[in-house]
Every structure is written in C-alpha cells, then in structure tokens.
Amino acid sequence: LHSGAGFGKSSALAQYFYDTKEAFSWYSISEEDDNILPFLRYLVHSIRRVVPTFGSSLLEDNIHFIYPKETELTRWYSLFCNELAIINTPFTIVLDDYHLVDHVFHINYVIEKIIEFLPPSINLVIASRIRPKWTVLLKLKLNGQLVELKEQDFMFSEEEIQVFFED
C-alpha cells in the first residue's frame, strides 16, 4: 500500500484485520528505527505476538555490528527466513510507515531477501508513503504474487462521497 499521508492506509489495514480476524504481526516503524539492528529486533518482537518462540536464534545471536557487512546481513536474513519456514501458523506481517526507513540500504537489502524466501503461508504487507524501489517487486507482479494499492485506490468516488454524507 502506498499513498500520501492521511489517505487511510493504516486505518484500512486495521479494519481489514479486525473484520477478518486473521492472525497478523504489526510493526509501526518510527524515524528512530533507521538502523538495521533495532529494526530486526523490533520486527522479531512484532512477530512474537503471533508466534511467541519466533526469532530465538536471532535474539540470541550476538548482533553488535554498527555497520554490518554483507556476510552478516546474509546470515541474519537466512536465520530469519529459516525461522519463518518452520512456522505452521498462517499470518501476515505488516510493516507500517515503511517510508521512514526506505532510505536505509541494509534494511531494504534484508527485507528484499526476506520477500524472496517468504513461505507461502506468510504474507507481507508494506504500508508506505512511497513505493519501495525493490527489484523483486517486478518479479512478484509478473508472477501474480503482488497486490498493489495506490493513492487512487484510497480515494472516494463521487458515489461513495454521497453515501458517506448520507449515512
């Protein structure tokens, strides 16, 4: 989901999960989360809301690099994906306000790799003010694995506006 501020991305997602009662983890990203290490920890803890044992190997790992090398990033997303692969519970991971960390290479690198190896029982929803520039998005779109909601999808039609004010 990508659209400007105030278009209702977060509200629409919250309403969807309330209505469907589907299992989900929700990570509301803040400006302070623009470092890969806290980002991964917060992501793991958000998933633990659905799967309490998730991420033990990541949290036990001695992650202390301020500027991790590609080998460390590869190890982290491998551990993360391995932990996702053993989850039997279907659920959705929501990353809300992703635009706040979209400029961080390490976060984009890890998220793009996670998307590539995401098990079929787990969905990932990104809510952002801008469309991420990941190369994997084109592949997903061509394979019919990407649902993209844009700003126009959040705008009311004239009929919807009329119904809104009549109710």
Regions from the PLM with identified roles:
Residues 1-28, 41-45, 131:
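P-loop NTPase Walker A phosphate-binding motif
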Residues 32-33, 99-103:
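Short acidic, S/G/P-rich loop/turn micro-motifs used as interaction or catalytic elements
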